[in-house]
From Swiss-Prot:
Protein name: Small ribosomal subunit protein uS8
Keyword terms, alphabetized: Ribonucleoprotein, Ribosomal protein, RNA-binding, rRNA-binding
GO molecular function, one term: rRNA binding
Record GO cellular component, one term: ribosome
Organism for this UniProt entry: Chlorobium chlorochromatii (strain CaD3)
Classification of source organism: Bacteria, Pseudomonadati, Chlorobiota, Chlorobiia, Chlorobiales
Name of the gene encoding the protein in the UniProt record: rpsH
Length: 131
């Protein structure tokens, strides 16, 4: 059965792997998912990711990050904009949890955080929020 919302699938796979205390998870590849993974790596929410190409299809292998207590580094990961209800925000996007968490946006400048969007003066589609 085909996936209608690939970003929701990406988020769910990461969330489920964290709850199951798995060290890695495999996700079907797309350029958007690679860009999101790069952003999560830069912000310290994941340990690493690699693009693995097989004969059938490429996929992303994401190495999850855990705290010393054993809890996942990602406490909350929630989809905001959905196929049935797209959510856009302008350049004055509000902070998530007073700046403790992040909104991840798809903008004309690529995949960026809410802080970067405010600094660059751009808006975009709010893909998800992470804490």
């Amino acid at each position: 059965m085909p996936v209608t919302d690939s970003i929701a699938d990406y988020i769910t796979r990461i969330r489920n792997a964290g709850r199951a205390k798995n060290s890695t998870t495999d996700i079907p590849y797309s350029k958007l998912k690679e860009n999101i993974s790069q952003l999560l790596l830069e912000k310290g929410y994941i340990k690493n990711f690699t693009v693995i190409t097989t004969e059938k299809f490429p996929f992303l292998r994401i190495d999850l990050k855990y705290m010393q207590s054993g809890e996942p580094a990602i406490k909350e990961l929630t989809r905001v904009s959905k196929p049935g209800r797209r959510v856009y925000d302008g350049k004055d996007i509000k902070k998530y949890l007073g700046g403790l968490g992040l909104y991840v946006l798809s903008s004309s400048k690529g995949v960026i955080t809410d802080k970067e969007a405010r600094a660059q003066g751009v808006g975009g589609e709010i893909l998800f929020r992470i804490y």
